Swiss-Prot record:
Residues 188-197, 288-305 have a biased composition (Low complexity). Residues 94-103, 230-243, 410-419 have a biased composition (Basic and acidic residues). Keywords: Lipid metabolism. Residues 1-25, 41-419 are annotated as: Disordered. Residues 451-540 form the EH domain. Positive regulator of phosphatidylinositol 4,5-bisphosphate turnover and negatively regulates signaling through the cell integrity pathway. Involved in rDNA silencing. This is Increased rDNA silencing protein 4. The keyword Lipid metabolism applies. Residues 207-216 have a biased composition (Pro residues). GO terms for biological process: lipid metabolic process. InterPro entries: EF-hand-dom_pair (IPR011992), EH_dom (IPR000261). Belongs to the IRS4 family. Residues 349-367, 395-409 have a biased composition (Basic residues).
Amino acid sequence: MAKPSTPSRRVVLPRSLNNSTVNPPASAAALQGALLAFSHAVPPKPQSPMMADRPPVSLLDSDPDPPSELPEPGSIKGKIALFSANSTATAPSDRPRSAHESVPEIARQKSPQLLAAEIATGSVQGPGGKTTSDDVQRTRLQRNGAVPSRDLSSPIPVRKPVINPRLLDPYQDETPEHSPPKPGSDQRPVSSKSSASPRPPIRKPRPVPPPIPRKPSPALSEPASKSASHRFENGLRRDEARKPPLPLRSKASAATLSEERPPTLPPRRAATAHDLYINQSTPGRAESPAGLSSSPSVVSLYSPAHNASRTSVHTVASRDAPSDAVAASSTASNRALQARKSPPPPPPQRRRRSRSRSLLHVQHKKDRTPNPSPGGLRETLRPQARSDDEDEQRRRQHKSHIINKHPHKHNEGERRRWRSEITEKERKRYEGVWAANKGLLIHPSQVLDENLEPDKIPPGMYPPAALDMVVNLVVRDIWSRSRLPNHVLEQIWNLVDGQKIGLLTRAEFVVGMWLIDQQLRGHKLPAVVSESVWASVTRVPGISLEPYNTKH
């Protein structure tokens, strides 16, 4: 039968000792020293079945401000040696234990280094199932022979340890009660070895955490994009930059994640008509998952899964963003120009004819006489200009004078003077105007009979040849189109009107038209029209009107 535990073994600390807590920096220093000693001495143990379901805990999930100073290794080793010696002296291995002080198999396998780490951080669980520093101090006082003042019904709560005790020992068993550890026969060499010269460090391989389940893509999940945009609006980007990086994953998991996740793109600006056109013209980019929307790139940059590689992505994206934009714009413009400037399809080629038919066609072409190509404008019914034309001669003489002689010298012999006759060309032109206007505004009843004598013509009647004459009203209308003053036109009328009856014959009308042209060319009007001018109008070319007997 197991002996009940004597009350002298449980030492209750006074209130002053319970209230005095260990400073957080000292406890953190003791924790780091214990961890260092544990990593040097304890080999890796197989994971217990009770801890198989517990997820791996990262060391960086605790307080983000651990102390930077490490304790001296001598003090930690001394504490561990003292603890092992006291436990050996006070707790013999053959002492029977009570039922409530029985320790499970996992607690028996704990080494002195693990127990030292638990004592340093105050992680030994009390009788109530909670770890308190009172139990640790009670154990120390019992071993040192201190007498407790009085028992307390319940321990006074002290300040919580700085670091989670689960971080110290992943194999710690959560049992409702723990009795003081029973040192075995294998503890003495371990303690002696720990106090002796240090062994070469044996690093415990970290357990490989299971691969983090891949979250749904932010481009395809709407809630993720909404939460990311909300965090981006609240300014969580600066908070994430201040936090320490997440624990590094193993190489295998990092390789799988890098293969599965495509590289993220930088945040794009607001979509415009030009961007929509580029996306439509480049189907390769439109089908990519990053091109589904403008927000996924922002969400992927600020999601927790990408915090570790966020800075490198920013630097690479900032460098590649201008080049990608330039390349996209150039390709889009080139494709647009090619689509616009693509030439129409060539016309279908003619089928090649047989050789015999082509030879016959060539012979037929040779037999035909080529049509004379027109050298210039097509000829009309008008006759060509004669060599005696006044304008043609004047132009030729003027050109020759400019080339051969000095332009400021005058040749009196070739000077154009007043002509005493009307050319045939001018006469024909004036006679055409007369023929178109003769007999206008003359009533046939006003024309006298040819049998009447000129002395018996009543007033208001016209001579018998009045139908071949032009009335003064018609003459004034035609001559006024020359834009000469009225007094000049009156002078010309007086020079050519010989009948004084308000009518002009053919010769009078032609001479009057000729005088108007001379006035327009800058010549002065003569006092009397010369006979040569009248003769050039009345003479028919090729026929002499003179009587035959005058020549003899």
